[in-house]
Amino acid sequence: HVDYFLHTVLIGAETVENEIRTIQCADDEGLFTVSAKAFVDATGDANLSRLAGAKLIWGNDGGHPQAATLTFRLSGVAADVDLSPAAVERAVVRAKAEGIRNLTREKGFILRMENSGIVHVLLPSIIPEGLSAEEMTRMERETRKQVLGYLQALRTYMPGMEHSELAVIGPSIGFRETRKLVGKE
């Protein structure tokens, strides 16, 4: 039998002889403890492993994680706009040259929802330096500024996007790589 909880924050782990015995969690009602024979760290950032004292690395073997991305969606995009990576790069390079701020990378993807004037933009990005509340807030603020810069760049320098509107910004940045568990050495 496997139980799982949504809307829960992992806040601690108790280990005995390198084995996790209990985890401490929080939800909107307060704190609670979970005991089990086995736990699976499905946090995506090795949070349970870190709290249990496991050996971890940050990013790749050189200590460099991949960029985190904040996606956003535009509506009102013309049907015939060139959304190729080369067209995106040309527009962003030109926008940077013309002084549009907060454009951190030139290469990215814009993906159209089938048979619509709605596109998903994967451009705003940042290299994570940690996962503390302070660092997460800094990254969220920075990438949200980037969204506005990319919106201006695409409206100005990509023909067919002049009348596009910001429909939605992703709820939070998405990570590809942060902490990883070190396996058997």
Q: What do these predicted regions represent?
A:
Residues 6-21:
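A conserved short coil-to-beta-strand element within the FAD-binding core of flavoproteins
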Residues 1-4:
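N-terminal Rossmann-like dinucleotide/flavin-binding domain of flavoprotein oxidoreductases
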Residues 6-10, 26-27, 31-38, 42-185:
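Flavin (FAD/FMN)-binding glycine-rich loop and adjacent Rossmann-like elements that form
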